[in-house]
A protein has these predicted regions:
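Cell-envelope and extracellular/periplasmic
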Residues: 1-258
Length: 258
């Protein structure tokens, strides 16, 4: 293994948690990458499924033990950097940005996991970069968080992660369409739903222009979320394994180029 280790922390809601249609195959371990597991304070090969259920639902592993974007993201990152990666999955579906802020139980839970992973990784080699990767916003679109409020909360969250986790950059995988596509959301038209989605998209696009701590890794979710070929047929608004592979590869390659 390379003696320089990068820590990649993955946060957000269900599409970061992973809510795909099945366990991907093939499912080979990612070379030069490990996943940190908090409950056992150990490293495991980075394969599907990722994550773990912690503290009565504050964090969840990949839904039903199926797929996520993490392995493809890390495989692309390793291929483009030649470095060793420790992946830390700290996501939970159906969460607004306000539920991740410092002072909430979820923040404390995620922080314990990340700090545990960083300390354990020091036994493997020298830690170089610590990056946070975020895929979230569908719930804020549902509840119509304003652009200004979303930016204010995400900036506060990032600032606290810089202090408490030592992150070097906050990478954003821009959220896709959700309110404008799901069948079960009956309190607005599809056009209104897309407008709600675009408020969060705009917030994420603006924040990377206004604050250099943020970096846009990919906007591909806007395209994939409107194409049934990339949607889990069993879960409206959630990406299938084919989509996760594309999102992970594109975002991981982008982060490697920083």
């Amino acid at each position: 293994m390379h003696n320089k280790i990068d820590i990649l922390i993955f946060g957000g809601q269900s599409n970061m948690q992973g809510e795909t249609e099945c366990l991907p195959a093939p499912n080979d371990p990612v070379e030069n990458a490990l996943e940190y597991r908090y409950l056992s304070n150990s490293f495991v090969p980075l394969v599907h499924p990722v994550g773990e259920d912690i503290e009565d639902g504050l964090l969840w592993g990949a839904d039903k033990g199926f797929g996520s974007l993490l392995p493809d993201f890390c495989r692309a990152y390793v291929a483009n950097t030649g470095k060793t990666v420790v992946a830390i999955h700290a996501a939970r579906g159906a969460t607004m940005v306000s539920e991740w802020l410092k002072g909430t139980p979820r923040y404390d839970c995620a922080l314990k996991k990340v700090q545990g992973g960083i300390e354990a990784a020091k036994q493997l080699g020298e830690i170089d970069k610590i990056y946070y990767i975020w895929l979230q916003g569908e719930s804020d679109a549902i509840f119509r968080t304003t652009c200004a409020d979303y930016k204010k909360m995400l900036t506060a969250y990032k600032n606290d992660l810089k202090v408490d986790m030592g992150i070097h950059k906050f990478g954003i995988i821009e959220v896709g369409y959700f309110c404008g596509t799901v069948r079960w959301l009956q309190d607005r038209t599809k056009e209104e739903g897309r407008m709600d989605d675009e408020i969060i998209m705009t917030a994420q696009e603006q924040i990377v222009e206004e604050d250099n701590d943020f970096v846009m890794l990919t906007q591909i979710c806007k395209e994939l979320s409107l194409n049934a070929e990339y949607i889990n047929p069993d879960a409206d608004g959630h990406y299938n394994n084919k989509a996760m592979a594309r999102i992970g590869q594109e975002a991981g390659t982008a982060l490697a180029k920083l």
